[in-house]
């Protein structure tokens, strides 16, 4: 695949997004620590996601919101990302302050989660749940930029860092599902509060930029006009636009399942424990993909991974339309490894190969904005009446 930018940092081979650095370029004795702290943050952050994605609709339903109101509360943060996520990413790239913005977002999520427990009724819940979801979503592209920095400087394996987030999601899903069966939907909020606290701690433990690049980033930080010009140049390239459309469509196909999947399965008589287990099965499949991607898929191109994700999504959601029994839901959930995992890996690999490092965070945010903002928000909003 040709690079849109001739000046972009050295690309990587295969899905194991590894940098082509020499031994002289690498910084000794710090790469492992860098990767461990990023992995720790992924694990903490995904405690929030492990409640927010599958079980926030269950909590909203328990607070008496209608299906349309649940869809709106879930969709509004996606829409707000259109402005907030790119703006934060541009400032983070301009200032070289991804870590600082992550810390601020983590504290905002913690404060919103504290307030949410006292909210009742559609408007008060929307006023607090939307900032909570937005803060949680804003953290993802910022920490992805930090992870990609580790890939480029220390030749770290992105999948090995990211899989700890997926494992955290699995464990939390199992705990929340079982706890809801015993104690009701309010249990979800308590675990999410713990998740926000852990995320605050992990955010403060995130690594600073590698020493070899910190001074360079400070002295040669791109002007906002330079970042804007680079981003506009990307949008003029058909390959970048095709990437955004493909990745966004594949990710948005999950919208109705994320919003109403748990509620629909409960209506079918599936227990909370089994709902948590089904989510766990899907994410474990994703973990397995991340774990082997660096060795098994190293020769695959980003577009191949995106095509695999899209094809699996067509099969998965077509079968889901017939309300399959539990024994069919289990293998269907295994397809999550492709519908989400392969799509996401393809997107991360595309960014690592095709864009300059100076706008990496901004492009990560653009991907998140279009995939998890425009496309996911529209699909989520539409799922309410359906």
What feature does the model see in each segment?
Residues 83-97, 180-181, 288-302:
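Helix-to-loop junctions at the C-terminal end of transmembrane segments
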Residues 21-33, 207-246:
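Juxtamembrane intracellular "pre-TM" segments in multi-pass secondary transporters
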Residues 25-78, 239-278, 344:
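Helix-loop boundary and gating motifs at the non-cytosolic
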Residues 67-68, 152-164, 272-273, 355-368:
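Loop-to-transmembrane helix entry/capping segments in MFS-fold secondary transporters
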Residues 100-114, 304-319:
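Structural signature of the two symmetry-related core transmembrane helices
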Residues 137-152, 342-356:
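Intracellular juxtamembrane helix-capping segments at the cytosolic ends
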Residues 43, 112-116, 122-141, 146, ...:
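Hydrophobic core of transmembrane alpha-helices in multi-pass small-molecule transporters
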Residues 187-205:
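Symmetry-related core transmembrane helices of the 12-TM Major Facilitator Superfamily/SLC fold
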């Amino acid at each position: 695949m040709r690079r849109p930018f001739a000046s972009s940092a050295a690309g990587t081979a295969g899905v194991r997004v590894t940098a082509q650095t020499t031994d002289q370029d690498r910084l000794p004795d710090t790469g492992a620590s860098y990767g461990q702290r990023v992995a720790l943050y992924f694990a903490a952050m995904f405690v929030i996601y492990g409640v927010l994605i599958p079980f926030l609709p269950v909590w909203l339903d328990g607070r008496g919101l209608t299906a349309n109101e649940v869809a709106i509360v879930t969709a509004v943060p996606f829409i707000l990302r259109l402005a907030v996520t790119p703006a934060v990413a541009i400032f983070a790239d301009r200032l070289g302050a991804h870590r600082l913005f992550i810390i601020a977002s983590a504290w905002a999520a913690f404060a919103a989660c504290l307030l949410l427990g006292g909210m009742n009724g559609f408007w008060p819940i929307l006023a607090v749940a939307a900032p909570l979801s937005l803060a949680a979503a804003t953290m993802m592209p910022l920490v992805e930029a930090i992870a990609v920095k580790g890939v480029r400087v220390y030749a770290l394996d992105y999948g090995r860092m990211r899989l700890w987030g997926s494992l955290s999601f699995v464990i939390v899903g199992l705990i929340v599902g079982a706890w809801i069966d015993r104690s009701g939907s309010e249990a979800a909020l308590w675990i999410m509060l713990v998740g926000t606290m852990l995320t605050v701690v992990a955010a403060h433990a995130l690594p600073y930029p590698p020493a070899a690049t910190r001074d360079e980033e400070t002295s040669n930080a791109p002007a906002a006009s330079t970042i804007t010009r680079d981003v506009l140049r990307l949008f003029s390239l058909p390959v970048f636009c095709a990437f955004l459309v493909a990745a966004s469509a594949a990710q948005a196909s999950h919208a109705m399942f994320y919003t109403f999947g748990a509620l629909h399965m409960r209506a079918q008589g599936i227990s909370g424990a089994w709902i948590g287990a089904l989510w766990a099965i899907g994410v474990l499949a994703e973990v397995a993909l991340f774990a082997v991607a660096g060795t098994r898929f190293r020769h695959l191109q980003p577009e191949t991974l995106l095509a695999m994700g899209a094809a699996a999504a067509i099969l998965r959601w077509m079968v889901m339309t017939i309300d399959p029994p539990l024994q069919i839901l289990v293998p269907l959930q295994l397809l999550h490894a492709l519908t989400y995992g392969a799509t996401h890996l393809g997107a991360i690999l595309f960014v690592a190969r095709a864009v300059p490092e100076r706008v990496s965070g901004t492009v990560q945010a653009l991907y998140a904005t279009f995939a998890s903002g425009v496309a996911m928000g529209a699909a989520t909003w539409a799922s309410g009446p359906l």
